[in-house]
Amino acid sequence: MTELTAATPTKRPATATDYVNLMKPRIMMLVVFTAVAGLAAASGMTGITMHPAMAAIAVLAVALGSGAAGAINMWYDADIDAIMSRTSTRPIPSGAVPKEEALTMGLIMSGVSVMLMWLASNWLAAALLAFSIFYYGVIYTMWLKRATPQNIVIGGGAGAFPPVIGWAAVTGNTPLDAWILFAIIFFWTPPHFWALSLLAHKEYAKVSVPMLPVTHGAKATRFQILVYTLVLIPVSLAPLATGLGGWIYGAVAGGLGLVFLAYAVAILRSKAGDDGAPAGDMKLARTAFLFSILYLFALFGAVLVEHAAGLHFPVFGA
């Protein structure tokens, strides 16, 4: 890896927004949403319910855990964040929040989140939350991200735990249905993030982060986006077979899955990520990236609506 150098940031007063941004709020929203969907699905499938106050505390614990992992990630990645234009305005490289303060915040929030989850639910949910924080903050951030082009594939497990945590908080166990929700996020992560990496591959190359377009080229990345999309679609339909997903979920997963596949095929045929790629091809990659976020929200939104609103009518399962 080449030596990283960046200008020392000029200290500026930190604002509340800086501390919120340190927790990666956009990621936190998706994490919390999928956890709530897992919680609702567990209740709907088993008939077990949590006291509303305990459920709210469990969701808060997930949010704090996500924020903790984000702060630890920003602490460790401050050196490369300062060099990449996409991340140079983050709280640490911009000089608003000292690195040590970000780490302290992340560690304290980690402990508080796990303790709250344990008090509100059970040891299994707390242990899964602790592991997911460790997975993202240490395994992915400190090891995989700068070590292998499979960083997103293996590291994607960190972001796939929230629905499992939500399920465990309700029932104290993690059956097949919980792991199906895990698998949906796990296989969604590579095509989602690689679409972004096609746009930012020069930035990653500049800081020697071995994202797939940097190590294997844009063409190979475009192909892998299609491969993982082809895996994701049947995985996303698995809830229909177990009874976890009903007619609403099936319509959403089937319809949006076809759109996702269309984007993947279009990206494969494009020059997105190549040097001198047409602006339209790069716009396609960005649109696919944004659509993938909508796709995941819609899938888990369908799970949430079916089980929380009494609209769960299984297609095949009991």
UniProtKB/Swiss-Prot annotation:
Membrane topology: Multi-pass membrane protein
Assembly and interaction partners: Interacts with CtaA.
Residues spanning the membrane: 27-47, 52-72, 103-123, 124-144, 152-172, 179-199, 225-245, 248-268, 288-308
InterPro entries according to UniProt: Protohaem_IX_farnesylTrfase, UbiA_prenyltransferase, UbiA_prenylTrfase_CS, UbiA_sf
Protein purpose: Converts heme B (protoheme IX) to heme O by substitution of the vinyl group on carbon 2 of heme B porphyrin ring with a hydroxyethyl farnesyl side group.
GO BP: heme O biosynthetic process
Lineage top rank: taxon: Bacteria
Cross-referenced Pfam families: UbiA
One MF annotation (Gene Ontology) recorded for this entry: protoheme IX farnesyltransferase activity
Name assigned to this protein: Protoheme IX farnesyltransferase
Pathway: Porphyrin-containing compound metabolism; heme O biosynthesis; heme O from protoheme: step 1/1
EC category name: transferase
PANTHER family associated with the record: 4-HYDROXYBENZOATE SOLANESYLTRANSFERASE, PROTOHEME IX FARNESYLTRANSFERASE, MITOCHONDRIAL
Subcellular location: Cell inner membrane
Family, similarity comment: Belongs to the UbiA prenyltransferase family. Protoheme IX farnesyltransferase subfamily.
